[in-house]
């Protein structure tokens, strides 16, 4: 699902393989006479949503001088985005940069197709169970998710990229549980 999407032929084939394996297990229990005394519990680890683009908030933090790139990595920063797929933590090291960072994120959100649905304050984020050390939490809009890079603001998601960049996905998780269809 991460590489190809929720309802992709590849995801459906994987579900069929799991169904066959479960059928083999249940058949073996029946054959061994253990069916009545065995409890089989099947759990799913998480839900996902299809995505079309990855969003990189650090692009604007670097551009605004709130973060510096050295030797291919963000080294010095006053504000930085840390991805959590459908959500993104924004950390601000310098308390005097909180308002500037909030203004920058608000401007990002105002752009057409920003990929950002909501921004939560530190207090709102902590009440949701998020890291109380963050300054903000962003939730991605439908079809988007976050990544930590800085070279560009957005990048097309999907399986065609999976050989060159594992983090470019076609479906992901990490959204708030009140999300429609999640």
Indicate residue ranges for each PLM-predicted region.
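A long, amphipathic alpha-helix that forms part
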Residues: 1-38
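Glycine-rich, often proline-containing surface loops adjacent to acidic residues and nearby aromatics
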Residues: 1-3, 84-89, 182
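Secreted, luminal/periplasmic, and some membrane-associated catalytic domains
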Residues: 24-168
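Generic structural "secondary-structure junction" signal
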Residues: 5-6, 92, 130, 177-178
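Intrinsically disordered, low-complexity N-terminal regions enriched in serine/proline/glycine
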Residues: 3, 58-59, 174, 181
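Short, intrinsically disordered, charge-balanced linker/junction segments flanking boundaries
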Residues: 163, 169-182
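A generic structural signal for solvent-exposed, polar alpha-helical segments
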Residues: 10, 156-159, 181
């Amino acid at each position: 699902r991460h590489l190809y999407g929720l309802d992709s032929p590849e995801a459906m084939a994987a579900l069929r393989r799991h169904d066959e394996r479960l059928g083999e297990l249940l058949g073996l229990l029946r054959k061994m006479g253990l069916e009545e005394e065995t409890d089989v519990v099947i759990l799913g680890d998480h839900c996902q949503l299809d995505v079309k683009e990855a969003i990189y908030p650090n692009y604007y933090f670097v551009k605004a001088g709130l973060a510096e790139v050295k030797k291919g990595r963000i080294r010095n920063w006053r504000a930085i985005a840390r991805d959590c797929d459908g959500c993104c933590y924004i950390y601000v090291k310098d308390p005097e940069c909180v308002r500037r960072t909030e203004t920058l994120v608000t401007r990002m959100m105002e752009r057409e197709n920003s990929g950002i649905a909501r921004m939560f304050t530190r207090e709102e984020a902590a009440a949701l169970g998020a890291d109380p050390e963050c300054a903000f939490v962003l939730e991605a809009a439908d079809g988007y998710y976050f990544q930590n890079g800085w070279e560009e603001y957005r990048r097309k998601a999907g399986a065609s990229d999976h050989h060159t960049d594992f983090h470019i996905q076609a479906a992901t998780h990490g959204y708030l549980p009140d999300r429609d269809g999640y």
